[in-house]
Amino acid sequence: MAVFLLLLALGLLLAKPSESRMKGTTEQFSQEEMQPAAKQTLEESANSTLSDKNTGLSISKHVMSATPLTPRRLSFIIPKGNTMRDGRNCVNSLRVWRTEVDGNASCQLGNDFIHGSMDVSLRIPKATRGKCEQTPKPSSSGSLGLERTTCKVLAGHQCLRSHEHSITSLKKILTVLASNSLMSWLVSGCKL
C-alpha cells in the first residue's frame, strides 16, 4: 500500500504542468480557397490555461502574395500579461499584424495549438487581412491564469468560428492512476 501511495504521489507530481510552454500558432495561406466577395469577419478565440507568468503565445504568419516569388513572413511573441486597447494599440511589446493579400491569392489558416502531446488543428478558409489581440482574464483557481487570444481576419466569405481550448492534466492523472493501479496489482500478485 505504501508503494502504491508513493507511486501515486510521483505520478501526480509528473502529471502536474511544470512551466507549461504555450502554443505556437501557424497560419499559412494557400491558393484555391480564395473567392472574391464582400469582406466578412472571422473571429477565432482560443482560451488557454496558463500556469506561469513567463509563458507566452508565439504566432507566426506566412503570407504568399499573388506572385509566388514574393513570400512574406510576419511573426511576434505575446508575453502573458500584455493587453490590447480597442483592438488597435498594444501595451508593452505586442504588435498588431495586418496583412493585405491580393484578390487573386487565397488564404488558408491552419492553427495548431500544442500543449504537451495534445494537438488541436483548425482549418479556416481564406483571409485578406487580420489582427490579433490578447486579453488576460483571471481564473477561479489562484495560480492559474486564463488568457484569451482573439484573431480577427477579414475574409472573402463569412466563416465565424469560436473555439475555446482549455488544457488540464486530467488525462495524464487518469493515465498515471491506471498504471499505478496495475503496478500495485502486479506487485501484490507476485507476493502471493
From Swiss-Prot:
Coiled coil: none annotated. InterPro entries: RNaseA (IPR001427). This is Putative inactive ribonuclease 11. The keyword Metal-binding does not apply. Its main location: secreted. GO terms for cellular component: extracellular region. Residues 43-54 have a biased composition (Polar residues). Residues 21-54 are annotated as: Disordered. Keywords: Glycoprotein, Secreted, Signal. Glycans are attached at residues 47, 104. The lineage of its organism: Eukaryota, Metazoa, Chordata, Craniata, Vertebrata. Belongs to the pancreatic ribonuclease family. It is found in: Secreted. GO terms for molecular function: nucleic acid binding. Residues 1-15 form the signal peptide. The keyword Glycoprotein applies. It comes from Mus musculus.
